[in-house]
């Protein structure tokens, strides 16, 4: 992957289980289950699927005694599967009671998510917040203080509205709401530090559901603290709308060096895999050049020269195959996540894109000779034809991974250079 020089916002370094967040650590991908946590088997299975898809931290709901009682079992089930992904407990309303009554839950989690807006009101709320912070200190756990637009601390908001009404130059209501989110997060972090929690165990988030509001809030929050920030557009929505909205907001902030963990909060389509939010988060980071997770396939959009759907089917097959193989490949073949593959539909851009990729195939368009040249490291390697092109090209990709990224392939990677012949344009 081409290097991208984006100056990251300086932050503290926080450890969440074995995962480092903030400072010079890579931007981390997070996800969340939608299972009933009281169903230990079902929750562990979904956590495992999310981790296999590439989620580096997984959040689970801890909302009842039944759920809290199964957290340790979920952790054990994952350990038995060889899955060490850190678990984050998502607490609302009754987190103090659940952590007190189920100490195994407190120990099994790597991080506690606390929402200042619903931990409790007044002195009672302060006591509940303090108990959760002290529990995190006792077990050396990280804490994310996560403020949400939809559950903002109403007492804080009322206090700020009163002060704003008395101000000589009052803020417009939308700006006041943004400021209330930021103040809630910063004041809660200050309270946690006063109680005794190390600043190096704190992550902040201020989530809203509007793209421009999210950008404004995080720009301001990022300039007023050195805590790592978790990015996410809450209630982003379903399908393409959710993907576009999340990407539009997060890409702007990431380009400015703001953000240390991200989650794409998609509403799944009926029957859709929960892992899609992980794939979208990875692809966002990878297309921005911030990280590499899996080889990505370059494919043309199609036009009148590509009336067949064959190249689309092959591109989809190859992308799916690469994702399926990555849990094994990332362990066996370091560097394979940077591999570039091209599946092109006709002679116009097909050969050129295929030469620019590590490995590429240029399929015949409408009216072209029914052959498909394959290019490896910029050079034409073989020409495929017939009904077995998908299987043959898949085998070529598989062999390329083994020879280039396997044992003995490191030297080849170091010395490999790509020469792309440029033909002069005829007058």
UniProtKB/Swiss-Prot annotation:
Q: Which cofactor does it need?
A: [4Fe-4S] cluster
Q: Which residues bind [4Fe-4S] cluster?
A: 300, 303, 346, 353
Q: Does the keyword Transcription apply?
A: no
Keyword Metal-binding among record annotations: yes
Q: Which reaction does it catalyse?
A: (2E)-4-hydroxy-3-methylbut-2-enyl diphosphate + oxidized [flavodoxin] + H2O + 2 H(+) = 2-C-methyl-D-erythritol 2,4-cyclic diphosphate + reduced [flavodoxin]
Q: What is the main EC category here?
A: oxidoreductase
Entry keywords, A to Z: 4Fe-4S, Iron, Iron-sulfur, Isoprene biosynthesis, Metal-binding, Oxidoreductase
- Quick one: which pathway? Isoprenoid biosynthesis; isopentenyl diphosphate biosynthesis via DXP pathway; isopentenyl diphosphate from 1-deoxy-D-xylulose 5-phosphate: step 5/6
Query: What does the record give as EC number?
Result: 1.17.7.3
Any single biological process term in GO: isopentenyl diphosphate biosynthetic process, methylerythritol 4-phosphate pathway
Pfam families recorded:
GcpE
How is the co-factor bound, per the entry? Binds 1 [4Fe-4S] cluster.
| UniProt xrefs under InterPro entries | Dihydropteroate_synth-like_sf (IPR011005), IspG_bac (IPR016425), IspG_bac-typ (IPR004588), NO2/SO3_Rdtase_4Fe4S_sf (IPR045854)
User: What are this entry's molecular-function GO terms?
Assistant: 4 iron, 4 sulfur cluster binding; 4-hydroxy-3-methylbut-2-en-1-yl diphosphate synthase activity (ferredoxin); 4-hydroxy-3-methylbut-2-enyl-diphosphate synthase activity (flavodoxin); iron ion binding
Query: What family name appears in the similarity comment?
Result: Belongs to the IspG family.
- Mind telling me which PANTHER family this protein's record contains? 4-HYDROXY-3-METHYLBUT-2-EN-1-YL DIPHOSPHATE SYNTHASE, 4-HYDROXY-3-METHYLBUT-2-EN-1-YL DIPHOSPHATE SYNTHASE (FERREDOXIN), CHLOROPLASTIC
Which function does this protein serve? Answer: Converts 2C-methyl-D-erythritol 2,4-cyclodiphosphate (ME-2,4cPP) into 1-hydroxy-2-methyl-2-(E)-butenyl 4-diphosphate.
UniProt protein name: 4-hydroxy-3-methylbut-2-en-1-yl diphosphate synthase (flavodoxin)
* Organism whose genome encodes this protein: Chromobacterium violaceum (strain ATCC 12472 / DSM 30191 / JCM 1249 / CCUG 213 / NBRC 12614 / NCIMB 9131 / NCTC 9757 / MK)
């Amino acid at each position: 992957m081409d290097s991208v020089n984006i100056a990251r916002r300086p932050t503290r370094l926080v450890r969440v289980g074995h995962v480092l967040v903030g400072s010079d650590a890579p931007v981390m991908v997070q996800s969340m289950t939608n299972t009933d946590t009281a169903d230990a088997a079902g929750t562990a299975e979904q956590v495992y699927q999310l981790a296999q898809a590439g989620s580096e931290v997984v959040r689970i709901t801890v909302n009842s005694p039944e759920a809290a009682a199964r957290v340790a079992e979920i952790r054990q089930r994952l350990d038995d599967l060889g899955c060490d992904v850190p678990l984050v407990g998502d607490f609302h309303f009754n987190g103090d009671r659940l952590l007190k009554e189920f100490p195994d839950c407190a120990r099994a989690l790597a991080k506690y998510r606390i929402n200042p807006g619903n931990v409790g009101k007044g002195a009672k709320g302060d006591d509940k917040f303090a108990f959760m912070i002290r529990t995190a200190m006792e077990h050396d756990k990280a804490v994310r203080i996560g403020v949400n637009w939809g559950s903002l601390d109403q007492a804080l908001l009322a206090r700020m509205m009163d002060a704003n009404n008395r101000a000589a130059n009052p803020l417009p209501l939308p700006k006041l709401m943004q400021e209330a989110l930021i103040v809630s997060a910063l004041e809660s972090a200050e309270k946690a530090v006063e109680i005794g929690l190390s600043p190096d165990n704190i992550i902040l988030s201020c989530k809203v559901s509007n793209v421009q509001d999210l950008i404004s809030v995080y720009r301001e929050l990022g300039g007023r603290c050195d805590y790592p920030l978790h990015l996410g557009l809450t209630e982003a929505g379903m399908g393409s709308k959710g993907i576009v909205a999340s990407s539009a907001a997060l890409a702007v902030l990431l380009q400015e060096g703001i953000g240390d963990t991200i989650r794409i909060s998609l509403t799944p389509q009926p029957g859709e895999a929960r892992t899609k939010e992980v794939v979208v988060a990875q692809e966002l980071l990878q297309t921005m050049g911030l990280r590499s997770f899996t080889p990505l396939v370059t494919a043309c959009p199609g036009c009148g020269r590509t009336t067949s759907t064959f190249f689309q089917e092959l591109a989809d097959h190859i992308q799916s195959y690469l994702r399926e193989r990555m849990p094994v490949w990332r362990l066996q073949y370091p560097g394979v996540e940077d591999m570039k593959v091209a599946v092109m539909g006709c002679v116009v851009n097909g050969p050129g894109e295929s030469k620019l990729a590590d490995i590429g195939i240029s399929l015949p368009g409408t009216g072209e000779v029914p052959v498909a040249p394959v290019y490896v490291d910029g050079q034409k390697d073989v020409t495929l034809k017939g009904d077995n092109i998908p299987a043959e090209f898949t085998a070529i990709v598989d062999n390329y991974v083994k020879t280039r990224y396997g044992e003995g392939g490191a030297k080849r990677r170091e010395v490999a250079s790509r020469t792309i012949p440029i033909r002069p344009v005829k007058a």
